[in-house]
């Protein structure tokens, strides 16, 4: 991998990680369109450490408060009913599905799941799901045709059941094209959470999974066509770009609809199918044994 490739891929990772359009799919597609090697699951996982570092800094006050309350709850029973302490436990509970499935499906994640036909399918299907979830949220917020505004849930209403559902939604993102934020935000909206609450828990929930996955994949850096230098460079680029994107996105969702992302996902999936059908792109473009 050249330094230019690592810069472009780091830029793509930073731009797309927090948007509900799938960063792993865009890394895969960028390499395929450019005629580069597929960066692979290891590069994707490690570059995501950069964007998760952006989450750690952006939500540093929330995270510090949650960690402090969670650690105190281990020895102080009176803290176990504290909202922040419970949030710490719910992030752990919500991380279980992706941990189990990530280990179980490792071979599929690094192979069949990177087929461009599957990516096109998930882009379209999950785009439709996000669109439905967005419309339901908008109906509650505006009252729909009957003008009956429904109060949506916040993170104070989050329990173990909803936390696990969020977790399984996150696990779906092991398939490129699904989108970690897209799946978890869609799940949150369908369960009745506000846009801001759904996005906030989505980003907090991703921290353990992404950091663990990136740490696990460190052993594969230096093998094949991905070396340490370009990988670290891409991770740094992803961090700086990702921080700017998450700051913008958290403001965007308070007043705007997710429909632009829905339309983009569906159009990208359709175009990808057309290019594959026309023979312009191979479903396995960029894949190699190294």
From Swiss-Prot:
InterPro entries given in the database record: UppP
Catalytic reactions on record: di-trans,octa-cis-undecaprenyl diphosphate + H2O = di-trans,octa-cis-undecaprenyl phosphate + phosphate + H(+)
Record EC number: 3.6.1.27
Keywords linked to the UniProt accession: Antibiotic resistance, Cell membrane, Cell shape, Cell wall biogenesis/degradation, Hydrolase, Membrane, Peptidoglycan synthesis, Transmembrane, Transmembrane helix
Subcellular location: Cell membrane
An annotated GO cellular component: plasma membrane
Pfam families in alphabetical order: BacA
Transmembrane regions: 39-59, 85-105, 118-138, 202-222, 230-250, 261-281
Predominant location category: membrane
Gene Ontology terms, MF aspect: undecaprenyl-diphosphatase activity
A biological process from GO: regulation of cell shape
Membrane topology recorded in Swiss-Prot or TrEMBL: Multi-pass membrane protein
Highest taxon above the source species: Bacteria
Note: Bacitracin is thought to be involved in the inhibition of peptidoglycan synthesis by sequestering undecaprenyl diphosphate, thereby reducing the pool of lipid carrier available.
Family indicated by similarity: Belongs to the UppP family.
Protein name (Swiss-Prot/TrEMBL): Undecaprenyl-diphosphatase
Species this protein is from: Streptomyces griseus subsp. griseus (strain JCM 4626 / CBS 651.72 / NBRC 13350 / KCC S-0626 / ISP 5235)
């Amino acid at each position: 991998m050249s330094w230019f490739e690592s810069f472009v891929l780091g830029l793509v990772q930073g731009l797309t990680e927090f948007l509900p359009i799938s960063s792993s799919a865009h890394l895969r597609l960028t390499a395929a369109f450019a005629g580069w090697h597929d960066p692979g699951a290891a590069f994707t996982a490690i570059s995501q450490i950069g964007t998760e570092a952006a989450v750690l800094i952006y939500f540093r006050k929330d995270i510090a408060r949650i960690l402090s309350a969670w650690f105190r709850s281990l020895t102080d029973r009176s803290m176990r009913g504290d909202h922040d302490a419970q949030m710490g436990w719910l992030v752990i509970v919500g991380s279980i599905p992706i941990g189990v499935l990530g280990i179980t499906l490792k071979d599929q994640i690094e192979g069949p799941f990177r087929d461009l036909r599957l990516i096109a399918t998930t882009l379209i299907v999950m785009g439709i799901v996000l669109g439905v979830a967005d419309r339901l949220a908008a109906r509650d917020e505006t009252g729909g045709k009957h003008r009956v505004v429904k109060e949506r849930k916040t993170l104070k209403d989050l329990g173990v059941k909803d936390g696990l559902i969020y977790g399984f939604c996150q696990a779906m993102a092991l398939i490129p094209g699904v989108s970690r934020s897209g799946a978890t935000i869609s799940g949150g909206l369908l369960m009745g959470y506000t846009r801001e609450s759904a996005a906030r828990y989505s980003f907090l929930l991703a921290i353990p999974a992404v950091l663990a996955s990136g740490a696990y994949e460190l052993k594969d850096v230096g093998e094949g066509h991905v070396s340490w230098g370009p990988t670290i460079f891409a991770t740094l680029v992803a961090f700086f770009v990702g921080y700017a994107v998450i700051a913008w996105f958290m403001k965007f969702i308070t007043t705007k609809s997710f429909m632009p992302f829905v339309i983009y996902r569906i159009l990208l999936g359709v175009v990808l199918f057309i290019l594959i059908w026309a023979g312009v792109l191979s479903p396995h473009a960029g894949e190699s044994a190294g």
